[in-house]
Amino acid sequence: MPRKIEEIKDFLLTARRKDAKSVKIKKNKDNVKFKVRCSRYLYTLVITDKEKAEKLKQSLPPGLAVKEPK
């Protein structure tokens, strides 16, 4: 089931959770979507600023599998 996250801080807390499995990064021309898969929900954060998206990509936890479909 999907859930939307509005704040970057909340997304990072969710990504650091023990049940977080992977992160998918989907890029469009307008925005970047970060989707983190946890045991119950798929949490989505939408960012329209490309620079913020790059910073967030670098601040993801190192143990998490990051998938970037082309």
Curated annotation (Swiss-Prot):
Subcellular location: Cytoplasm
Keywords: Acetylation, Cytoplasm, Isopeptide bond, Ribonucleoprotein, Ribosomal protein, Ubl conjugation
Entry-linked Pfam families: Ribosomal_L38e (PF01781)
Principal localisation: cytoplasm
Any one GO MF annotation of this record: structural constituent of ribosome
InterPro entries documented for this protein: Ribosomal_eL38, Ribosomal_eL38_sf
Alphabetical list of PANTHER family matching this protein: 60S RIBOSOMAL PROTEIN L38, LARGE RIBOSOMAL SUBUNIT PROTEIN EL38
Protein name: Large ribosomal subunit protein eL38
Organism: Macaca fascicularis (Crab-eating macaque)
